[in-house]
Curated annotation (Swiss-Prot):
This is UPF0173 metal-dependent hydrolase MTH_1902. The lineage of its organism: Archaea, Methanobacteriati, Methanobacteriota, Methanomada group, Methanobacteria. GO terms for molecular function: hydrolase activity. It comes from Methanothermobacter thermautotrophicus (strain ATCC 29096 / DSM 1053 / JCM 10044 / NBRC 100330 / Delta H) (Methanobacterium thermoautotrophicum). It holds the Pfam family Lactamase_B_3. It comes from the Archaea. Keywords: Hydrolase. NCBIfam families: PRK00685.1. Belongs to the UPF0173 family.
Amino acid sequence: MRIQWFGHSAFEITSSDTRILLDPFISNNPVCSTAVEEFEPDVICVTHGHADHLGDAMEIAERTGALLIANHELSVFFSRQGLESTGMNIGGKISIDGIGIRMVDAKHSSDIDFTEEVTSGGSACGFIIETREGKVYHAGDTGLFADMRDVIGEIYRPDIALLPIGDRYTMGPEDAAVAAGWIKPEKVLPMHYNTFPVIEQNPEIFAELVERTSPGTEVVILDVGGFYEY
């Protein structure tokens, strides 16, 4: 399994021949140099409706025919734009090409904020991608919440966690380190930081905190465009 980071919360997970793109904020992402036209995903998962997460999802889906996966409200919005989409809700799971995609809770807002009028984008979420190589938890935008320990950590037990550390709009390094301690993944990759001045963070500080909260977890810090093989 290959996990590639494109800055902010944009990742592509490749397992066998299936490519899953998550929160593809690409063309307006100031730290990403990859062109939108380079993406050829099979599936696009969107955690919520904010423009820095929905990003280029609709453009990529229209060009490639990729299936959009999101909460019910966003899925209806996508379908009304003529795009192939399937809706889910918290706790649900679907399977595509032998890969499980489970929607889990996140503590954040989700209005669609790039149209002329702000409209409801349903509830923000995270995803657990279950491949034959392992499980990856993409937290989306979220604050710290107890189900990270009681549900995500205790029941779903992801091998890899992708956690926001930018603060202000999500967890900061301290709370993200607590989350890592609750979830206890084998690996944790920080995300949603250093895209804009208001979320500037030093990921090495996060790594130092995780050494204390979850000594068995390795922190993997990727450069933008870099990837990790698991």
